[in-house]
């Protein structure tokens, strides 16, 4: 019975897009090679600076600056000529894995590195692929290990206990400060009790609510009225109060004698359509007809 082969392990972003990786690598190698060539020419000019013209050296410096700026732009675009700026996220998301290690000299590797690397062995892979810490970090770790081994066990225990005590005191102090801030924020009232009680009393009993009184408008000032000219009378206007006592006296005599009051055109003032008669006060009764007993029935 034959069993199927197990599927290969799935690794995230492991050469998922080999074409883009190859294109980005070629672009980066090209930019780095151009910058390296200019740097070599500048180093030769500095060795022969007495014989080298300064304008040519300044031109090389400007060319190197433009190449370095183009290299930085290519790194921001992950080596893609027409990509967007992701600041190398595409290159960091892909893993470089060593496919073969050998101690024999490799001509292709020598030609690519210009003779700096003879073979891809176990001693070079950790340094170039950064799979182990830097030598400076290793030296610091060795110094710490040496100091620890030089001290006695009792001294180390006492120092550890003192450090733990100081750290615990610092942590407790920080926790107490945080707790105090939290309690102060929780206990701080967000309302005023007096204002709340005042609002409740005003809603339930109407306490503290004042009604706004509206002031009555002032009465209009009275002005003297004049009579309009009649069709048969004079054209000049006459005041109303001129014929008022005689007219009221004749009406009063007619009412006391039992007859119907007669209105006379001579006694009635003529008013215009827009004017109304206004009397400032009631005229007194005629003193000759004060008592109704003098008239006969």
Swiss-Prot record:
InterPro entries: Mediatior_Med8_fun/met (IPR019364). One of its GO terms (molecular function) is transcription coregulator activity. Residues 204-297 are annotated as: Disordered. The keyword Transcription regulation applies. It comes from the Eukaryota. Keywords: Activator, Nucleus, Transcription, Transcription regulation. Component of the Mediator complex, a coactivator involved in the regulated transcription of nearly all RNA polymerase II-dependent genes. Mediator functions as a bridge to convey information from gene-specific regulatory proteins to the basal RNA polymerase II transcription machinery. Mediator is recruited to promoters by direct interactions with regulatory proteins and serves as a scaffold for the assembly of a functional preinitiation complex with RNA polymerase II and the general transcription factors. This is Mediator of RNA polymerase II transcription subunit 8. It comes from Caenorhabditis elegans.
